Amino acid sequence: MFSFFRRKKKQETPALEEAQIQETAAKAESELAQIVENIKEDAESLAESVKGQVESAVETVSGAVEQVKETVAEMLSEAEEAAEKAAEQVEAAKEAVAETVGEAVGQVQEAVATTEEHKLGWAARLKQGLTKSRDKMAKSLAGVFGGGQIDEDLYEELETVLITSDMGMEATEYLMKDVRDRVSLKGLKDGNELRGALKEALYDLIKPLEKPLVLPETKEPFVIMLAGINGAGKTTSIGKLAKYFQAQGKSVLLAAGDTFRAAAREQLQAWGERNNVTVISQTTGDSAAVCFDAVQAAKARGIDIVLADTAGRLPTQLHLMEEIKKVKRVLQKAMPDAPHEIIVVLDANIGQNAVNQVKAFDDALGLTGLIVTKLDGTAKGGILAALASDRPVPVRYIGVGEGIDDLRPFDARAFVDALLD
C-alpha cells in the first residue's frame, strides 16, 4: 500500500519539473526577447544619436571649410590689393627717384658749370661773359688802337667799328663827338691813346642807365611786373631774381601770369620748387586774374616781393599789348600803387630791335627798368649804348650766363672795362 503511494509520487515529479522548465524557458524567452527588444531600441537610439552627431560634425566641418575658404579668399584678395598697392608705390618711388636724380644731376651740372665762375668773382665773370663782344671789337679796333697818328681816316675806322657793334647811329655820333673833344682837350696824338678816350666816353653815355633797384622798407608787398617777347628769358630771369632777393633776406611769391603757355607755368613751378618759393597759378583764366590773386595772397601772407610773369608778345600784336595794359590796371586794383616796378626783359642777341621793343613797351606800360639777358651769347654788346642814347630806361640787371647767380645789378664801369679792356 505504501509502495503504491510512493510510486505514484515518483510519477508526478517529472511532469512538474517539465512544467517548471517550460515556464522557466518561456520566462527566459520572454526576458530574452525583452532584452533583444531593449538592445534593438538602444541600438536604434544609438544609431540615431551617432547619425545626428555625425551629421552635426559634418555640418560643423562643412561650415569650417566654407569659413576657411572665405578667409583664404579674403586673404588672397587682400594680398592682391597689397601687391597692387606695393607695385604702385614702387612705380611712384621709381618716378620720384628718377625726378630727384634728374634734378640732382641738373643741379650738379649747373654747379660744375658755374663753380669756376663763382671763384672768379662777378667782374671776371662779366668779362668772361662779354668775350664774344669784346673779341669782335678787339679785332675791329686793332687797327685803330694799333698806333699811328690820329686823323680823319682813324676816326672813320672807329666810327665804322661802333656802328657794326650795334651801338646805333645816335650813340655812335655821340661817342665820336665825345672822343674828338677828349682828343682835342687832352692833346692826344697817338692811336694807342684813343682806347682810354673811348672807354670814358662810353662810360659817360651808359652811366645814367646804372640805377640799381632799391626796395623800400614797407609792410606791403613790392610788386614787380615783367614783360617781353617770347624767348627773351623772362621766366628764367624771374627764377634768378627770386634767388637774388632771397639772398637779401626777402620773402618772394611768384605769379604764373603767362597763361598762354603751359610750359611757362611748369617752368615757373620748377623755379619755385628750386627756390622753395610759392607759385600762384591757374590752369584756366587770364593773366590779370592770376596776378591779382598773387598780390592778394602776398598781402595775406606778409610776403615782401611779388614777381609777376606775363605772356610773351610782340609789340606789333596790338590785342596782346592791350591785354598787358589790363594786367597793369588789375594790379592797380589789387594795390593802388602797384605795380611798383615794370621791367621788360630783352635778349641782347636781337641787337637794334631791342630799342624798338623798349619804345613800344615803354609807350604802353611806362617802363621803370630793363633786364638785358644773354650778353654771353652775342657779339652785340654795344646795344646798351644804343638804349642809353635812344630810350634811356634804367638797366636794373644784366645776365651773362646760365647759372642761377649770373643775373646781377648793372654796373656801368664794370661793363665798359669788360667790353674794352
Curated annotation (Swiss-Prot):
Q: Which gene encodes it?
A: ftsY
Listed under subunit, the entry gives: Part of the signal recognition particle protein translocation system, which is composed of SRP and FtsY. SRP is a ribonucleoprotein composed of Ffh and a 4.5S RNA molecule.
Entries under InterPro entries matching the protein: AAA+_ATPase, P-loop_NTPase, Signal_recog_particl_SRP54_hlx, SR_rcpt_FtsY, SRP/SRP_N, SRP54_GTPase_dom, SRP54_N_sf
Q: Which organism is it from?
A: Neisseria meningitidis serogroup B (strain ATCC BAA-335 / MC58)
* Name of the protein in its database record: Signal recognition particle receptor FtsY
Q: Where in the cell is it found?
A: Cell inner membrane; Cytoplasm
Q: Which HAMAP family match?
A: FtsY
Q: Which Pfam families match?
A: SRP54, SRP54_N
* Keyword Hydrolase belongs to the record: yes
The Gene Ontology terms for molecular function here are:
ATP hydrolysis activity; GTP binding; GTPase activity; signal recognition particle binding
Q: Which GO terms describe its biological process?
A: protein targeting; SRP-dependent cotranslational protein targeting to membrane
Please name the PANTHER family in this protein's record: SIGNAL RECOGNITION PARTICLE RECEPTOR SUBUNIT ALPHA (PTHR43134:SF1)
| Catalytic activity reported | GTP + H2O = GDP + phosphate + H(+)
What is this protein for, i.e. what is its function?
Involved in targeting and insertion of nascent membrane proteins into the cytoplasmic membrane. Acts as a receptor for the complex formed by the signal recognition particle (SRP) and the ribosome-nascent chain (RNC). Interaction with SRP-RNC leads to the transfer of the RNC complex to the Sec translocase for insertion into the membrane, the hydrolysis of GTP by both Ffh and FtsY, and the dissociation of the SRP-FtsY complex into the individual components.
Enzyme Commission number(s) = 3.6.5.4
Tell me which UniProt keywords the record has, alphabetically.
Cell inner membrane, Cell membrane, Cytoplasm, GTP-binding, Hydrolase, Membrane, Nucleotide-binding, Receptor
Taken from the UniProt entry, a GO cellular component term is: plasma membrane
User: Transmembrane region positions?
Assistant: none
